[in-house]
Amino acid sequence: RHQIAHVARWSRPRLRPCDLANAVSAGKTQAVPYGVTLIMAPWNYPFLLTLEPLAGALAAGNTVVIKPSAYAPASSAVLKQICEEAFDPRLVTVVEGGRAENEALLDECWDKIFFTGSVPVGKLVMERASKNLTPVTLELGGKSPCIVDATANLKVAARRIAFGKWLNVGQTCVAPDYLLVDTRVHDELLGLIKEEVRRMFGEHPLDNEDYGHIVNAKHFARVRGLIDPDKVVLGGTARESSLKIEPTILDGVTPDDAVMQEEIYGPILTVLTFESL
């Protein structure tokens, strides 16, 4: 509804000033559809991160091919069913599959590619798109820090950090990846975060049906391998049979530790300290 209500205003021609050499001319910009677009969606929030760009693409007058992630096959099947029931296939088409299908789609010449996912795959998408000078929107991950100084409201900070970190068991591109905390409030903040974790998931998170799973065995092994037992101050236990890892805090981490060399994308919060900003 929002797109439909505003797209006419968004696409209205807009007058633009001209430079001195073209002072007698009149300039304007005109918004037009890109054309045939490709949306490559991730597995962590498959409906939101597929349907949101789809709504924008359709409102702007484009046709769309959707490629859901093979890591979420059940969601992919539901998205395909919804689109087949709601849209003419000439307007919206869903292509399911894995790496082979991704490669085949990237061999095509698109008018626009919208990709959400990891940095390595994002680099590949941009490289392949560059061969046809296809414009690309990349929504990638990163190591998002939380910085807490001595003036912060620690209860609010703890609640927000815990929610952002362990929502979807850390499998969120904007989840806090590591915590930079003033040494003066370090102990109090960690105590409050631990309280929030217990409030959210109870004393036994691995038995909590509302506490999520790591997406697959490959990612489970990678995330578990980042846990340094000597630095665990909360959690640290993993259950391979259910692909669950406890909400885990690693304290006393240094920038050279293995866990600081890549995006965690799991339920591990690493803690570093500072004396002053």
Region annotations inferred by a language model:
Residues 242-246, 262-268:
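Conserved glycine-rich beta-strand-loop-beta hairpin in the small C-terminal domain of fold type I
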Residues 30, 104-106, 223-226, 264:
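Structural alpha-helical scaffold elements that stabilize or flank donor/cofactor-binding regions
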Residues 87, 120-255, 273-277:
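ALDH superfamily catalytic-core signature
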Residues 20-156, 198, 274:
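Rossmann-like NAD(P) dinucleotide-binding subdomain of oxidoreductase/dehydrogenase enzymes
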Residues 259:
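Active-site loop ensemble at the mouth of alpha/beta enzyme cores that anchors a bound cofactor
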Residues 92, 268-269:
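Short, conserved active-site loop motifs that form the nucleotide-linked donor/cofactor pocket
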Residues 1-28, 199:
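N-terminal Rossmann-like NAD(P)+-binding subdomain of aldehyde/semialdehyde dehydrogenases
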Residues 11, 96, 234-236:
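Short loop/edge segments at beta-strand edges and connector loops
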